[in-house]
Curated annotation (Swiss-Prot):
Protein's name according to its UniProt entry: Probable ECA polymerase
Subcellular location field: Cell inner membrane
Organism, scientific name: Shigella dysenteriae serotype 1 (strain Sd197)
Gene: wzyE
A biological process from GO: enterobacterial common antigen biosynthetic process
Domain of life the protein comes from: Bacteria
GO annotations of cellular component type: plasma membrane
Lineage: Bacteria, Pseudomonadati, Pseudomonadota, Gammaproteobacteria, Enterobacterales
Length: 450
């Protein structure tokens, strides 16, 4: 890449970044937080944060990248995607009408809410316990990170339930919403994330998500400022780099350490070059249609229920890894959101996907606002826990693609909804057995005086 070509790419990158950052800033000033703000920051991180890192790798370490015209296409496709997404998100689908009291779909009380978070936490802890009994601490047993996807590891399906510890702790926080509950959320979820990091053998997702939710709650409540958020972001990047070194068993120093930091940070937070690689091989892609979305559900079907279930699932990430990169190491390489759309239907699917994503984020913001307006604090805690708990799925959406997001968000909704139903059933059983006693003002006063 020549200096002139880099200059042209830099101008396009700067314009796209300023365009998205400006719209995000105005939205932040208006509402302080919603899921449009979160997705916009996540989109910036995924598709634009990596460009400066790539530039340093090219000019400092002479690393080969896709041709400049392909990199330009990647930047422009990301910018155009966001423009279509933003217009879709801001388009009102129906006229605003005065709030009319409606019969709520469901309601929650104190016992049901506490039972819900206990069940969610129980699912996570039991899953971790069973996985640990089968495999021990994989971080200290395996020689390479790719081995966690091999037949040596049993009970891999249990990992999908680990994440429900975070929604459980979110319910606990939203029931109190003070600084002590906020700090307890951080300590408990990060400690759990570190535990799963050692047990699973290097998976950092639970740590990243817990830290991100902690920061956004702090921004919403005004407990941290923007400069503190930026400082925490830098600390998070350094922390993820250190965990990556431990995961891959790397011991580096000097120029090698700087080089390793650049490419690991780019691959962790901003795999935008993967989109460029897909565009570079555009003519060789056999468009998969909506099949990757259907195939991604295969991993949630146990083999005893479907004996003939394919052992290798050809979703967009695996198609990109196996067919485009010809990589059969056992790791699935993230195609990014736009890359998954390219795999499914080429350039035509990019604006269509942007419209779909705009509607998805609009739905999450509708739920979030519903929780903000809810007068029943127990129901509000459940709604907010569901919304913030889905942040992991939004990260999957930006990094892994639409197909991975759909299967995971459906799984999340089913498990979360099942926990709600079980909690309500248990409450009904306890109440029928006479084990539930309603609190009265007189009994509370007696407890206080005693």
């Amino acid at each position: 890449m020549s200096l002139l070509q880099f200059s042209g790419l830099f101008v396009v990158w700067l314009l796209c970044t300023l365009f998205i950052a400006t719209l995000t800033w105005f939205e932040f000033r208006r509402v302080r937080f919603n899921f449009n703000v979160f997705f916009s920051l996540l989109f910036l991180l995924t598709f634009f944060f990596g460009f400066p890192l790539t530039s340093v790798l090219v000019f400092r370490f002479d690393v080969g990248v896709a041709p400049p015209e392909i990199l330009l296409q990647a930047l422009l496709s990301a910018g155009c995607f966001y423009a279509v997404y933003y217009v879709t998100y801001k388009t009102r689908l129906r006229k605003r009408v005065a709030d009319v009291p409606r019969r709520p779909l469901f309601t929650m009380n104190r016992v049901e809410t506490n039972l819900t978070w206990m069940i969610l936490m129980g699912i996570a802890l039991v899953s971790v316990g069973i996985f640990f009994m089968h495999n021990g601490f994989l971080l200290f047993r395996l020689n390479s990170y790719s081995q966690i996807f091999s037949s040596e590891v049993s009970g891999v399906a249990l990992k999908r339930f680990f994440y429900f510890f975070i929604p459980a702790m979110l319910v606990v926080y939203f029931l109190r919403q003070d600084s002590k509950a906020w700090l307890f959320f951080l300590v408990s979820t990060v400690a759990f994330g570190l535990l799963t990091y050692m047990i699973v053998g290097g998976t950092r997702a639970n740590i990243i998500i817990a830290f991100a939710i902690f920061l956004f709650i702090g921004i919403i409540r005004g407990w941290i400022s923007l400069w503190m958020l930026a400082a925490a972001g830098v600390l998070g990047i350094v922390g993820m780099f250190w965990l990556a070194l431990k995961r891959y068993g790397m011991n580096v120093s000097g120029d090698e350490a700087f080089y390793t930091f650049l490419y690991l940070t780019r691959d962790t937070f901003s795999p935008w070059e993967n989109l460029a690689l897909l565009l570079q091989n555009y003519d060789n892609i056999d468009f998969q249609g909506l099949a990757p979305i259907v195939r991604d559900f295969y991993v949630f079907i146990p083999s005893w229920l479907w004996p003939g279930r394919p052992s290798m699932v050809l979703n967009s990430a695996n198609y990109f890894t196996w067919e485009v990169l010809n990589n059969h190491s056992g790791l699935a390489i993230s195609p990014t959101l736009i890359g998954s759309l390219v795999v499914m239907g080429g350039a035509l699917f990019i604006p269509l996907g942007a419209i779909v994503v705009g509607l998805i984020i609009k739905w999450f913001d509708w739920l979030y606002e519903l929780g903000n307006r809810e007068t029943n604090r127990y129901k509000a805690a459940i709604l907010h826990s569901f919304c913030f708990g889905a942040i992991f799925n939004m990260i999957v959406l930006a990094r892994e693609g639409l197909d991975s997001f759909v299967s995971r968000v459906v799984f999340f909704i089913v498990v979360f909804g099942a926990c709600l139903m079980i909690a309500k059933l248990l409450y009904w059983l306890f109440e029928s057995a006479g084990l539930i006693h309603k609190r009265t003002k007189s009994s509370l006063r007696t407890q206080v005086e005693g």
